[in-house]
């Protein structure tokens, strides 16, 4: 539960960084969590 809460909060702030990095794991994680 805490992880979900943190992810949602970070997703907004890291959404830009994650998209830029778009690592293989991150890309899959985002695609599977979007």
UniProtKB/Swiss-Prot annotation:
It is found in: Nucleus; Cytoplasm. GO terms for cellular component: late endosome; nucleus. Keywords: Cytoplasm, Nucleus. Signal peptide: none annotated. One of its GO terms (molecular function) is DNA-binding transcription factor activity. It comes from the Eukaryota. Interacts with DDIT3 (isoform 1). This is DDIT3 upstream open reading frame protein. It comes from Mus musculus.
């Amino acid at each position: 539960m805490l992880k979900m809460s943190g992810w949602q909060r970070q997703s907004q702030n890291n959404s830009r960084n994650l998209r830029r990095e778009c690592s293989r794991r991150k890309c899959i994680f985002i695609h599977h969590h979007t």
